[in-house]
């Protein structure tokens, strides 16, 4: 016994047990209990583990319990040192605990009180030592600070969601403080117990229907409490021997039929309701401000009363609080909501998987990559910033991550929760249907004038077709839904406070209200949930807001539209669209999918991520007892499926590839199920197909591989009757009889060798798309191509004359390839055309859009509008005479004439053209003055004798994209353009390389002559002043360092450099802003320049400009000090708080005011400059490099050099480091530049010029923080393209000029 006692004592000492210290009054009230130890003590309450010496709880004998002693009055001092008495009503927590009966909540035993304190008694869990502990303690014991098994995470998530669903929907209780300190792990099976309801809120009392009943209950409760107080006072005056039942008399008897979840194990855990040594309210206590301003408002017995706790924003734990509460900088009873509990659940799960709930500039916590997509998606749904779109418990219970678990049955026995609602990926929750208003437009504007303030959702019915203006909407409207027939929506009239937009309108035509395709900033930046079910057009960059998380597009995306998905913002986590299955297998890649997406649906079917073309749909893990990781899908060969399995219950791979007919007849998937959507015949397949050989009726797509040998005659009935897509291989060249192509085929594609005559009726009337191979050259009689065809593409050898009726009247896209050179007029070209394309052999004089005029006789009057729908015209052929007015239809908006190099007469280009491509040898540059103002994109080519004539006055005023010789030109044009000389490959004499290095080297060198010619560009001495405003969009997704666009001010070029989380460790958590002189960075002769200015940086408050932040300074900018600014401009939390007004629509604005303080200093005449070649180094597979590496040796200034790169930084791990290293003897004084090329936006390349004297001892110089790794890897920045970066090095040799002196 002595040994055991000593061991127990040692164990308790090792656990840092707090010695019980209670007041005499508390000890007197708790005379029936032996206080074993105090678990937690703060200024508001004391929680302790106790042993009951006698008596029972609710007629049930227990040995141990948890007692929470809550002070009714607490003394504090305000900022003026005035004493404040804070009153607390502990009965509010009691009233909540009395209502709860759930397996995942510590059982409530009772309540008592005296004049100073309230006492709450709850269950103490008994189990094995070191088993019962909080999630916080468990994480601290794990070396990886996370639970490795995702099954544990799933089990914990399921328990907590079931509990919250019960609390929110059945009991109408909000917990308000869900975190790792308040969740207890009760056993080795990870059964959870939630406790500490001190911040909880009972929202049932706010129900309009129950107000009267609640008031009565309140009065009764108050009377009972007063009686209890009187009893306590009387009993305290009696002797202890005569008061054995005093405590029991004051306990609220509830849950008489409940059974404790504790077991009968003899050993007890040093934990229980208090969560071991962890503080029950430790999370709240650490995030509350320690200043005297933190107060609780005086509670009362009224259930309408509220509390207020100020939040310490400097504590990292504040991120555990829901953002809608954290932004108010205080926790209030009114601020708590069901969705704030969901945020706490997401943070708890994130900590369990090793994540960090801290929010950086991307607005949301980062979720570890090792998790399954289902798990990541579940956590993402819990951690959505906007509470309107954060999933509630009903939606979470339908999530795939927890939809099936072994814990479900045991929980259902204890939880009579309400039925859950089945939902899909595109579901968003609106808490009350009373918040929805249906608008039919019958009363006109009167309907909008009468919208109540509690309405949050407007749904427009089919009869509504009024114009929408911004003034119609009140600030409470956050959800809008428009019907399919609505066609008068101007996106610019939508308010900025919307979070959900569902628009069923059409985008196939351009209207007076919106363009055919979405443009940047069409959709309000505040939109989080966006549904465009009829949008089947290209996605432009920045057309989808950066905060959008849920996106639904159209059901008929094409190849170009699929490839444009790469322009979607990385914020999207759920994406859904539809397209032909063939496009998924041939064009969709993982790189096109937003990086944070965890749920992808195509054609209403879930796509498994990361996306693999070989298995886009995969198999689920409910086949046998396979050990699939984390509930993810896996692939099993179809022929290996056991017949005993219920295959129809599986999600089967939609595509099956067949090598021979025996496999076709024996394949279990084809013979037992109707789940196959696409059948592919391999290259080796070349057997006749017989009637009924393909039994599955679910097949809608049949394809013979491109190199397939199949060349067998098709008989009627050999192909599946429900086929909608048919694609032949290259070898197929058999005559087709009527009926051999199934009647439902809509997509028909022939291979290279097919060149058979087609009879009337061979192609079914259902067909909408036909593409012929390169060898097809048969005449087509009228009606052979059915009227249903909308897209017709011919191969390169097709060159047959066309007559009226050859092409259907409803065709929209017609493409002729290279050999076609036939005459076309309005009699042969359908009037329905939207897209028309000709090959290189076509003569433009043979195409007459206007029958009344020709290219030889100019038309003086506009022709009748015959081709009103033609918007795209691509003509790769040649011209013999210049274009005349009305040669082209006036409806064209996209025009490509890559062989046109002649004069542009006035009005020869239609006035609606927005995109124009001209020839590669254009010489008559002055005729650009005749181009229409509508042009936004212009591309052409010219030689060096012409390019110098181009100036901004010749460019259309609305043009924002200009390409010359394939290179992007920055607009506006402010200086004479120059042609870069052709790249020069290094010779054997200029590089000292091994033979292997020479084979691998593909670097190119550039000529610096252009920079040499512009050396005097910076020598202006203009002493004016000016200002510039910079808008930084998508700020929350910016990481590390980034730059503003270049701007001109006081005779120089500048840009601002930002550090999103501080420049260094001392400024972490701050926004750093510096101004950089780009002339000093980009020009090789800036070593001789010094520019002194005074400047002021202003972070504009976009809601209240008077509260903008300004900081002023002065600086002399030189090659050694080309940056200057502030490392701690503003704290990130203040910046990101939307209530402060600095970040609006995810955009910040910075104003720069500058004035020179002295003229420009130039010391150019002190040096001789040796002009030399630059070295370009292309680095492939950059994302896979982690160790330092060097470039091949290159020669410059007669010396040997290399570039040394540290992909993960030297010494900083968040930046790529780049150094120039001297590999020769002697000493060399040089002026050199290091440049990282932006391959998408060359004008935004990063380039630094610097002077350094190299020798054998100091042989290396460069930049440890050349560029942030996250910025480098960001595909939108353009530095990393095809996993390749390009580094350029330019070196100038500097030699001082020796002046000679003479005597007279």
From Swiss-Prot:
Full protein name: Probable inactive serine/threonine-protein kinase fnkC
Transmembrane segments: none
Chain residue ranges for the region called Disordered: 208-277
Stored InterPro entries: FNIP, Kinase-like_dom_sf, MATH/TRAF_dom, Prot_kinase_dom, STK_FNIP-Repeat, TRAF-like
GO molecular function, one term: protein kinase activity
MATH domain sequence ranges: 1025-1154, 1172-1291
Entry's family note: Belongs to the protein kinase superfamily. STE Ser/Thr protein kinase family.
Species: Dictyostelium discoideum
Biased composition annotated in UniProt, kind: Low complexity: 210-269
FNIP repeats: 514-556, 710-753, 754-797, 798-841, 900-943
Originating gene: fnkC
Binding-site residues for ATP, renumbered to this chain: 39-47, 68
